[in-house]
Amino acid sequence: IIYDEVHLLPAPIFRFTADIQSRRRLGLTATLVREDGMEGEVFSLIGPKRFDVPWKEIESQGYIAPAECVEVRVNLTETERMLYATAEPEDRYRYCSTTTTKRKVVEALVERHVEDQVLVIGQYISQLDELSEVLGVPLIKGDTPIKERERLFAQFRTGEIKCLVVSKVANFSIDLPDATIAIQVSGAFGS
């Protein structure tokens, strides 16, 4: 049995597949990180890790595009800082990820890279809906029909669409080699 995106295996919807009888199991993933901290469950379900390749090595071999990562710090307004300070600890990641100030920074970055192929990637659907509307660009999320996703990705690849807003659905088996800028606005562990 070959499990692609094996880090998903501990989820109830996939976990039952670990009960399928097999002499050999192979799990593949780009990153063995889970928001719920259940990474160790993967090994108990399919066995120990046998092979690990650092991403820089894969990059140097040409299997993935080289990336230059830049952190853009966003200064919250006084009101936003106060709301953050009084928020419940479990709500702070989401709050910082979805502030108006951050949205304005994303708008400025997209404007600055208007000639590039830009992906705006995020975790929170309401934030992505707002960004799609404000930027005037399409959004691909879980409820986007497969045919529509394929059409939008094809238009992005050809340059007909210069910017796409995408949810986590774009994390899985999507090859967008023409993307030159990725803006991560929110994620499972904050932003």
Identify what each model region corresponds to.
Residues I1, E5-H7, V169-A170, S186-A188:
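Conserved Walker B
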Residues E5-E71:
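Post-DEXD/H (motif II) to motif III coupling segment of the RecA-like Helicase ATP-binding lobe
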Residues T31-L32, I181, A188-S191:
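Conserved SF2 helicase motif VI
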Residues R34-M38, S173-L176, G190-S191:
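Switch/connector loops and helix/strand junctions flanking conserved nucleotide-binding motifs
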Residues T79-E133:
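Conserved interdomain hinge at the start of the Helicase C-terminal
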Residues Q117-I121, S126-I174:
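Conserved helicase ATPase core of P-loop NTP-dependent helicases/translocases
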Residues V165, F172-G187:
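A short beta-strand element within the Helicase C-terminal
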